[in-house]
Each structure stands twice: as structure tokens, then as C-alpha cells.
Amino acid sequence: MVRKLKFHEQKLLKQVDFLNWEVTDHNLHELRVLRRYRLQRREEYTRYNQLSRAVRELARRLRDLPERDPFRVRASAALLDKLYAMGLVPTRGSLELCDSVSASSFCRRRLPTLLLKLRMAQHLQAAVAFVEQGHVRVGPDVVTDPAFLVTRSMEDFVTWVDSSKIKRHVLEYNEERDDFDLDA
């Protein structure tokens, strides 16, 4: 037997319709992206979503301007150059490419995802652990934040830290280890 509901519980239940509730797909898509790219906080996803929405909105406003407008030409070129340099669009072709920018585009440029792409890690979970533990550097700087976005120009400079045991094991496996270099 079920107990009688208290007054405040009845008031709360009046606000909920258990028979006709809407299913929103946004939450499911959000959870898929969070799980697929191993995002640690939901705020990261919402931030990427806001940025992608702003890019799409800016591209739409630029497309609404007349085609011969010098401001449109300059701003479109600057926007496409910026997005291409960040790695969010594949080419500098046209403003139509800006419509494909999404939160997943930003997630694909995160450091752990690029470690997976560069075959420095087998799984995304391991890549996140390598970054958090300080085994990876981008250029001269050691990066410990998995949310670090890597641009196209910095993609070539993603390597292991010199003092990393993982680098030592990789070099030993490939028979390229030099005792003089690694004793630093």
C-alpha cells in the first residue's frame, strides 16, 4: 500500500504530465558527444555548442550581405582563414562550409582526440590519462588540460615529453633509444 502524498508533493506532481511528455533528442545527442569524446564536464559541450552557433550565425549574416560588398569579402576571407587554421573546416572554399561547424568539430580538435588520430594512444580514455598525467607536450609547453584545442599549425608539434617513460618505451620498442638523450 502506498502512503498518501504530502501537500507539497501533490503540488509538484500537478506540474508534471506523465501521459503527454515530450521526448527531446538534444539530451541524447549531448550524451553521445560527451561519451564519444570523453568530455569531463557538460559545460565544455555547451561552450562548444555556443561557439559553433556563433560561427554559423556570423556566416549567415555575412551571406545576407551583397556579394560585391568589400566588407563581406574581407570578413568572409578572415572567418574562413581562422576556421581553417583552427581545423574546423576542411578547406577555405566558401561560407557554406561554416554551416557544418558543430560542437563535434571542436571536440575533434581536442588534444586527446588528436593523440588518437596521430596513433600515440590506442583509446581515447588512455589519451586523456596521458594528457592529464603530463606525458604530452605541444611545442615546448607541457599540456595537462584535455580540453586544449590544437590548431593545424601546432598539430605537427604534438610529441611526448622528453622525461616521459612512455617515450622511453616507444623508443626502446623501435630500437631508437639513445642513452645520452634520455638521461636529462
UniProtKB/Swiss-Prot annotation:
<dbReference type="InterPro" id="IPR001912">
    <property type="entry name" value="Ribosomal_uS4_N"/>
</dbReference>
<dbReference type="InterPro" id="IPR036986">
    <property type="entry name" value="S4_RNA-bd_sf"/>
</dbReference>
<dbReference type="GO" id="GO:0034457">
    <property type="term" value="C:Mpp10 complex"/>
</dbReference>
<keyword id="KW-0539">Nucleus</keyword>
<dbReference type="GO" id="GO:0019843">
    <property type="term" value="F:rRNA binding"/>
</dbReference>
<dbReference type="GO" id="GO:0005829">
    <property type="term" value="C:cytosol"/>
</dbReference>
<keyword id="KW-0694">RNA-binding</keyword>
<dbReference type="Pfam" id="PF00163">
    <property type="entry name" value="Ribosomal_S4"/>
</dbReference>
<dbReference type="GO" id="GO:0042274">
    <property type="term" value="P:ribosomal small subunit biogenesis"/>
</dbReference>
<dbReference type="GO" id="GO:0005730">
    <property type="term" value="C:nucleolus"/>
</dbReference>
<keyword id="KW-0699">rRNA-binding</keyword>
<comment type="function">
    <text>Component of the 60-80S U3 small nucleolar ribonucleoprotein (U3 snoRNP). Required for the early cleavages during pre-18S ribosomal RNA processing. Part of the small subunit (SSU) processome, first precursor of the small eukaryotic ribosomal subunit. During the assembly of the SSU processome in the nucleolus, many ribosome biogenesis factors, an RNA chaperone and ribosomal proteins associate with the nascent pre-rRNA and work in concert to generate RNA folding, modifications, rearrangements and cleavage as well as targeted degradation of pre-ribosomal RNA by the RNA exosome.</text>
</comment>
<protein>
    <recommendedName>
        <fullName>U3 small nucleolar ribonucleoprotein protein IMP3</fullName>
    </recommendedName>
</protein>
<dbReference type="GO" id="GO:0006364">
    <property type="term" value="P:rRNA processing"/>
</dbReference>
<keyword id="KW-0698">rRNA processing</keyword>
<dbReference type="InterPro" id="IPR022801">
    <property type="entry name" value="Ribosomal_uS4"/>
</dbReference>
<dbReference type="GO" id="GO:0030684">
    <property type="term" value="C:preribosome"/>
</dbReference>
<dbReference type="GO" id="GO:0005654">
    <property type="term" value="C:nucleoplasm"/>
</dbReference>
<comment type="similarity">
    <text>Belongs to the universal ribosomal protein uS4 family.</text>
</comment>
<feature type="domain" description="S4 RNA-binding">
    <location>
        <begin position="109"/>
        <end position="175"/>
    </location>
</feature>
<dbReference type="InterPro" id="IPR002942">
    <property type="entry name" value="S4_RNA-bd"/>
</dbReference>
<comment type="subunit">
    <text>Part of the small subunit (SSU) processome, composed of more than 70 proteins and the RNA chaperone small nucleolar RNA (snoRNA) U3. Component of a heterotrimeric complex containing IMP3, IMP4 and MPHOSPH10. Interacts with MPHOSPH10.</text>
</comment>
<keyword id="KW-0690">Ribosome biogenesis</keyword>
<dbReference type="GO" id="GO:0032040">
    <property type="term" value="C:small-subunit processome"/>
</dbReference>
<dbReference type="Pfam" id="PF01479">
    <property type="entry name" value="S4"/>
</dbReference>
<keyword id="KW-0687">Ribonucleoprotein</keyword>
